[in-house]
Amino acid sequence: MLRAIIVDDEPKAIQSLSWELSNFDKDIEIINTFTEADKAIKHINESSIDCLFLDIEMPTMDGFQLLEKLNKRDFAVVITTAYNEYAIKALKNEAIDYLLKPIDTDDLEATINRIKNHNSKNNSS
């Protein structure tokens, strides 16, 4: 079971991604969602998760700032954004992938496979 957290300032984006993930793969559990990055930090630091789906453009703190404030990064990070120009920066910040909104089902499938590969490599180390 993959345990994930979604952080996005748009509730509809959270709802849509949660729905797509649960319909795509029954082995994915969304353990929490947050619309404010600063409120997500403590929970992410205290949780045992496999993946963080993270929006970049948020009002009080952007996704890159959130990543800098995390105590640990032993999980896969997937950037979700409507802006193509964040893709390279996301990968430079050690995200394993990015998804452009609106999220394409084929892209989501490829991302889920990357998460599973990432986690199996980390678990075997």
Please give the residue ranges for each predicted region.
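CheY-like receiver
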Residues: 41-46, 50-124
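Two-component/phosphorelay signaling modules centered on CheY-like receiver
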Residues: 10-32
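Helix N-cap/capping motif at the beta->alpha junctions
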Residues: 18, 33-42, 63
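Conserved sequence signature across two-component system core domains
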Residues: 7-8, 34, 52
